[in-house]
Structures are given as C-alpha cells and as structure tokens.
C-alpha cells in the first residue's frame, strides 16, 4: 500500500486526493475479505521536513517571497535568479538537481503544500487502514513492513524504490527482494498519478527482463485515485504498463484470493 496517510485524504489532508476516502474503504474491505490468503502487507510512508527542495521554505524570489503551492521551478528560473535557495549553500545542489531532472525528461519540480511532516498527524497512516493493518497482523501473526521514503532534503522521492535523482544512487533492494519472493503482489494507495505510478514503474523497470515476476503484479484500480488534472494521463500510463510488462489492472471486487 502506497502512502495511505492522512495528508492525502480527501477533505482533511494538506495534499488531499479526491476519492481517497472511498479508496481506503474499498481497500480495507478487500483486505478483510482476503484476510486468510493475504500473507504480508507492506506500506510506504512519505516522511518529510519543512526544509526540502519541493517545499516552499526552500525557495525565495528576488523580494524574499516563498513560492505558492504548485509553483513549477525550472533550471532556468534558478540560473537567472527568478528563484533562489533560501540557504545560499544549497543553490549549486539545486541547480544540479534541476538540470538532471530536465535532461532526463522526468517530472518538473513542483512546490507541494507542506505534507507528511515527520511526527505530525498528517504523516500518520489513515485510521481505518491502520486498524485493518494491525487486525491483519494479529490474525496472521505477521508484522507489517513499513517503508519510509522522502527524507533526503535535496531530492524528490515519489516511488518506493528510489529518488527521482540521487548522487548516491540509492536503490531499496530490500523491497525489491521482498517482491521477488511473493506469488502475487497487489498495489493500492495514493496518488495513482504520482507515488503509485512511480512505484509501479520503478518495480517493473527493475524486473523488466523477468515477466514471471512482472505478471504477478496487479493494480487495484478502485483503491487509488489521481491528483486532479492527471486522470487521463494516468490511465494511459497504466495501460502502457499492462501492455509492456503484463501487469493486471483490476477492481478490488474482481480479486478474491
């Protein structure tokens, strides 16, 4: 389960995803129905601080104003002084990061509302999902796997496996090897357009030469929702993953383990 956290929940979170409350309800119902066959639950959690490259506190304009949420910051904007790092020591790192993003044709740097700040209510798992997670743990006598991501201040980390760009080239091999061990993998969470999609792509690219693994993966499409404006693009990308890697796209009601 990807980032089933309060800050992504509809009407209450700082980066709320429309449809997320119903997604969680369907996900917990699916987990309950399949309790006897669901071996393990792995959850990723966004875990941030205020001073990170995708938060407003990192940046100021020439007048000292911080950017508004959803501002896009480009390499040229920083190169020519439209935006600069609040801490001048970070400017060179920020320029390098933006250049790497743009040269790789990846996502643009978006300033997100402050979300999933470490230790806050918004960073916690949503309550009904948490209840089901630990009910599963008690019934199956297995500890849930919690994977924290997004703590590096100098980069974005949408996917569960690795950052968008990272000088250290960190890859979460523990997660990948856990995935390799299972007969079937079901992915749900928020948002389908960003962290779910990025996680799926990273996993599939790692196992791209082993269709016996990629074909085990199912996206529970009614247990995830996109950020507004990305609906059509997300559907097209999911269809492309299905075509290329043989994953399955199913409603939770269609999957009985």
Listing of model-derived features with the role each one plays in the protein:
Residues 2-42, 48-257:
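Active-site-adjacent betaalpha module
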């Amino acid at each position: 389960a990807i980032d089933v956290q309060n800050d992504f929940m509809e009407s209450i979170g700082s980066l709320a995803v429309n449809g997320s409350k119903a997604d969680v309800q369907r996900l917990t119902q699916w987990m309950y129905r399949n309790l006897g066959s669901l071996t393990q639950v792995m959850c990723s959690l966004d875990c941030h601080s205020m001073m990170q490259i995708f938060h407003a506190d990192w940046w100021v304009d020439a007048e000292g104003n911080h950017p508004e949420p959803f501002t896009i910051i480009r390499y040229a904007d920083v190169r020519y002084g439209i935006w600069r790092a609040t801490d001048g020591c970070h400017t060179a790192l920020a320029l390098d990061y933006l250049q790497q993003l743009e040269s790789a044709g990846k996502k643009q740097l978006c300033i997100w509302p402050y979300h999933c700040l470490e230790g806050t209510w918004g960073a916690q798992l949503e309550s009904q999902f948490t209840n089901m997670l630990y009910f599963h743990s008690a019934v199956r006598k297995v500890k849930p796997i919690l994977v924290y991501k997004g703590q590096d201040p100098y980069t974005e980390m949408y996917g569960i496996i690795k950052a968008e760009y990272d000088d250290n080239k960190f890859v979460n091999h523990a997660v990948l090897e856990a995935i390799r061990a299972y007969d079937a993998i079901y992915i749900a969470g928020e948002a389908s357009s960003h962290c779910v999609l990025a996680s799926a792509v990273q996993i599939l690219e790692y196992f791209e030469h082993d269709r016996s693994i990629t074909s085990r993966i199912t996206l529970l499409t009614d247990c995830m929702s996109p950020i507004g404006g990305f609906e059509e693009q997300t559907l097209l990308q999911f269809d492309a993953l299905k075509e290329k890697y043989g994953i399955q796209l199913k409603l939770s009601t269609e999957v009985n383990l």
